[in-house]
Amino acid sequence: MIERGKFRSLTLINWNGFFARTFDLDELVTTLSGGNGAGKSTTMAAFVTALIPDLTLLHFRNTTEAGATSGSRDKGLHGKLKAGVCYSVLDVVNSRHQRVLVGVRLQQVAGRDRKVDIKPFAIQGLPSAILPTQLLTETLNDRQARVLSLNELKDKIDTMEGVQLKQFNSITDYHSLMFDLGVVARRLRSASDRSKYYRLIEASLYGGISSAITRSLRDYLLPENGGVRKAFQDMEAALRENRMTLEAIRVTQSDRDLFKHLISEATNYVAADYMRHANERRIHLDQALELRRELFSSRKQLAAEQYKHVHMARELSEHAGAEGDLETDYQAASDHLNLVQTALRQQEKIERYEADLEELQIRLEEQSEVVAEAAEQQEENEARAEAAELEVDELKSQLADYQQALDVQQTRAIQYQQALTALERARELCHLPDLSADSADEWLDTYQAKEQEATERLLSLEQKMSVAQTAHSQFEQAYQLVASINGPVSRAEAWDVARELLRDASQQRHLAEQVQPLRMRLSELEQRLREQQDAERLLAEFCKRQGKNYDPEDLEALNDELEARIAALSDSVSQAGEQRMTLRQELEQIQSRVKTLTSHAPAWLAAQNSLNQISEQSGETFESGQQVTEYLQQLLEREREAIVERDEVGARKRAVDEEIERLSQPGGAEDARLNALAERFGGVLLSEIYDDVSFDDAPYFSALYGPSRHAIVVPDLSRVRDLLDGLEDCPEDLYLIEGDPQSFDDSVFSVEELEKAVVVKVAERQWRYSRFPSVPLFGRAARESRIESLHAEREALSERYATLSFDVQKTQRLHQAFSRFVGQHLAVAFEADPEAEIRKLNTRRSEIERAISQHENDNQQQRVQFEQAKEGVAQLNRLLPRLSLLADDSLADRVEEIQERLAEAQDAARFLSQHGKALAKLEPVASVLQSDPEQFDQLKQDYEQARQTQRDARQQAFALSEVVQRRAHFSYSDSAQMLNGNTDLNEKLRQRLEQAEAERTRAREALRTHAAKLSQYHQVLASLKSSFDTKKELLGDLQRELQDIGVRADAGAEERARQRRDELHTRLSNNRSRRNQLEKQLTLCEAEMDNLTRSLKRLERNYHEMREQVVSAKAGWCAVMRMVKDNGVERRLHRRELAYHSGDDLRSMSDKALGALRLAVADNEHLRDVLRLSEDPKRPERKIQFFVAVYQHLRERIRQDIIRTDDPVEAIEQMEIELGRLTEELTSREQKLAISSRSVANIIRKTIQREQNRIRMLNQGLQSVSFGQVNSVRLNVNVRESHATLLEVLAEQHEQHQDLFNSNRLTFSEALAKLWQRLNPQIDMGQRTAQTIGEELLDYRNYLEMEVEVNRGSDGWLRAESGALSTGEAIGTGMSILVMVVQSWEDESSRLRGKDISPCRLLFLDEAARLDARSIATLFELCERLQMQLIIAAPENISPEKGTTYKLVRKVFQNHEHVHVVGLRGFAAPPADALPGPAEVS
């Protein structure tokens, strides 16, 4: 028999009136006796505080402040403590004889709220010799002690070996320890449990029938059927979860396409944009690098162009300067040529004019003679004409005068006067004052003779003049020739000068004959000199081009060197061309190969993805296609093995399910037919009677009853006999035992217990030996243990079955994946990585491009060197033939010498050219210069004088002839004389007039004809003179101009000048062409530099923009990559095969996916908003956020009980594996989990029946309890009528309400609530839900009504109410009920606590003076029978006969208050020494 634990003592430290007081507690009743204020309630409060240290519950009423608020309420504890550290400690010895101190440290908290700080603790392993006061205080001297703080107490205990102090931060942990050690009867897990326990203590403390307990007796007495309720709840939860899972499967099946579509489109949408950005980033990086290369190349090219520009500008400036000089030289040469040509033309003109002048001179002389003759003849004709004219005029005037005289007298006078006038004129001309008309005739003859004489003399002089003029003209001609050759010279020196000139002329002719040879020699030397100058210029240019000065003698060696260099460079260039061709061919091959690999890469990447997938799924690494096919065969074998193992596990799981179902039968009946037979026979299953047997006792009873442990216990076997006839629906062996089901015991067998076995004497000659089963099934605890283990096994089997099913499905899908891989990708999967080869080829291509670029640069340099060498050789080819010229230093001197000789010869030739004809003319006539014909002037003067004399004589003769002709008029002295002779005179006059007019006409005609001739002669002469003078003047001008020109106009001058001009023109043209070429090149260079500068600026701008774009894109890309890696979606988004698509294709792919996504997420506001935000092209990370949001959304929609992954993509793969299997499994599970209404009714009925039996057992313990008029106390348990109807309908009429229980939309609890509403429509359900009502209806306690009844006097059994009982009766009745509650708690908790622990039982009773001695004795008897401790507080007049009594007296000494305690043993007890005296410790 297990000994019950006991409270040994209560220790109060530093309480009000108790400094260090230990109350030893009696094993039964401890009485605290004393007057009011003695400290009884303080002691009990300390005990209760140590038991339940919960300030939310502690409430000691006698010190409660009336009307105080809850915030400042004292709770009655603050005033019971003194300042400082206080302790309340219980010393307990449990059933294992373990000593444990449990208690609390209390301390007042300063403040107006009068709060108390409580700290629970426990001390284990303390030796029994150490008292609590010794442990909690420190003795200072004989009269003084100090209370230790909790830390000091801990330090003190740490020094004790084997002693352990535990402090608790929660009351639950504190009570858990107390329950495990058997200090409290019930595990107080929650505040509700603590509240129940405190209410029980409170009801015990203050006595009477507590309404708080009687109203909730079901909660105190009826244990919560947690197992059944939990089973229902678990079953419902399993069904609900099963249905939800099935619904989730159906939704998931419907969502699978949505998953696929959403994931596919989201992946396409985001991955395409992700890869497009990755491609663009790579392209931008490549572009940035390319721009940087172009930038550096452009800078280098610009520097080269600038250098080239400087070089060409310098060369252009040199050519421009040279061009100015050449233009000057060319212009000078052109001018010289023009001058030479002009001089030649002038010379030709001079010669032509000289010839013309000579011819004109001859013609002029001849014409002068003709004019002189014509002039003379004209003078004669004029004289005759004049005479004839005078005569005619005279005759006409005479005739007119005569005619007039005929008419008037005056006419004769006029004629007479005219005659006189003519006479006077004749006198004047002839100087004859005596001339008269009569002598006029004579004088006429005289003067005609004079005229004849003068004419003859004139002719003689003219002949002399002609001869003299000829001699004079020869002298003058010779003199003019000398003067023209030598210049002005005196006539006397003319002969000497002429002779000197003729002598020099021969020397001049000799020199002139040397002009042409000298000119040819000079032309040759000048040509050589020009060639020498050209050679020097070429040499200077060559040295300038070569950048080094060379001597002429070094040019041949340099030529050989340059030709060798040209040959080497030519070979190098040809080899470079071949090498370049080879490199370009290799580059083309690489590009072709890269193109082929690029087109092949997506298929290879798809194959690699598929290979990686099957490798991840299989956990294997495949190196060849043969390994794949071999592994495919292994998969087939593994699939067959997994299917066999799965079927075996499924069979075992079904067997376990059947066993669980069998063991879960109500009452422990393994056969459901036994329950029906028990109801039919009115008995109870033996297993149901022993349903509460402990797990440790189950093997014994199972072996004790053996095969009859499934027997039916009936009150009377005879009544059952008739029912056995015709019984068919029953087990093969049916055991019936007669006995009272309410008080059945195992006395029906004679049994002997052995080691792990029993021997049962069934009869005198029949024994049965039964060993304790290794897995007992007798009793609810054993069955529950077995069911629990079976459930664990079933869970393991289910998990194993699910695993195997999953493995089978996985293997099948893996087999399908391998089959697809073999069919689609095996041919390319194990080929070499095209991307790696592409990278190698790209590296090689870069190397080749660099090599080509370097080769081009080298080749360009070689070409430049080749062109330079070639140009040098060309220049040398022009220079080498002129090396002799370069070495000829005397050429210039020879040229100068020849030029001087040529100048002399040219001067001689020019002299001869100018004066050769004059010298030739002078040579034959030079001798005439010896004598000067001076008389020519006198002869000429005489000739002029004779001519004037002849002219005067002719005039005189004419005048005399006119007088002679008018001689008749002298006779007109009077008019009468004239009138008389008018007829004859008139006739004469007329005849004479006619003759005179005829003569005049002839004279006029002769004069006119001769005048015309003379005029013509004069015109010819004037023309000749004018022409002669003009040409002579022109000749002088031309000679002066020729002298002014200062150029030797010889025959070769023009050719030399033209050659010089043409040479300079060629050089100027070459210089201009070179300058133009340089200007064009310079313009092109400047344009190229401008283009390069603009290109450089553009490249710099583009490079900086691209670099900024790359840098900014890098930050955004880093954020994107960080987001991708943080969310683990890189594998989904980085689809390498998309890297081979163009940006437009990827953008089109993303746009198409975006359109599909808009439709797909149209009903999801969150995804729709995130998708809308992700459309911003400037925020690519939002697409990642959308992708993550899609994944998160899909993860949230993944049922983890169906699919064991968080990855939606893997979830889709697992869906295919799991959905079909789970659908089938969950459908069968739902059928198994379906709750039968009849089984629920049976379970509730059996539970109610069991609890009614337990309450009846408790009532047996209360039958002998009596208080005053109360003779007995009992608990009455009845089933409520409405609930009984519900049970009956569930058991018998459930088929009428299958619409509720077969509905998939309702849980069993909800269906039960709906049925309750159908059966009790009059009951208002309020605001409670059907689920809540159904859960209440599954709790059997709600079916029962409990009330306390007392058998009082003559009234019989009455309901226990405070108003119907006296105070003492009420206290006793309430104490009885509390004892029942404590005992019920112990029974309920027996399976939770160790089997070797029997908990302490202790109750309180304050103000026990209201009980009489009989009632107190009853309490003592109850305590003794129930092994219960009781603490009673009573006034001093109570002196119980049993137990321990403490007399408490509160005293005040010197303003110091303390309680004087005296302890006494009960009088009826065996003699014993008195307990220690009063404690005076202060």
Swiss-Prot record:
Residue ranges annotated as coiled coil are 337-418, 444-472, 509-601, 781-805, 835-1116, 1210-1265
Q: Where is the composition biased (Basic and acidic residues)?
A: 1051-1066
- UniProt keyword annotations, A-Z: ATP-binding, Cell cycle, Cell division, Chromosome partition, Coiled coil, Cytoplasm, DNA condensation, DNA-binding, Nucleotide-binding
* Localization: Cytoplasm, Nucleoid
- Region: Disordered, residue numbers: 1049-1077
A Gene Ontology cellular-component term: nucleoid
One of its GO biological process terms is: chromosome segregation
What GO molecular functions are on record for this protein? ATP binding; DNA binding
**Residues binding ATP:** G34, G35, N36, G37, A38, G39, K40, S41
One family name in Pfam for this protein: SbcC_Walker_B
Q: Does the keyword Acetylation apply?
A: no
* InterPro entries recorded: MukB, MukB/SMC, MukB_hinge, MukB_hinge_sf, MukB_N_dom, P-loop_NTPase
- Provide the residue span(s) of the region labelled Flexible hinge: 666-783
Return the HAMAP family for the record.
Answer: MukB (MF_01800)
Purpose: Plays a central role in chromosome condensation, segregation and cell cycle progression. Functions as a homodimer, which is essential for chromosome partition. Involved in negative DNA supercoiling in vivo, and by this means organize and compact chromosomes. May achieve or facilitate chromosome segregation by condensation DNA from both sides of a centrally located replisome during cell division.
Please provide the record's free-text comment about the domains of this protein: The hinge domain, which separates the large intramolecular coiled coil regions, allows the homodimerization, forming a V-shaped homodimer.
Assembly mode: Homodimerization via its hinge domain. Binds to DNA via its C-terminal region. Interacts, and probably forms a ternary complex, with MukE and MukF via its C-terminal region. The complex formation is stimulated by calcium or magnesium. Interacts with tubulin-related protein FtsZ.
> Which family is this protein grouped under?
Belongs to the SMC family. MukB subfamily.
Q: What is the name of the protein in this document?
A: Chromosome partition protein MukB
Originating organism: Cronobacter sakazakii (strain ATCC BAA-894) (Enterobacter sakazakii)
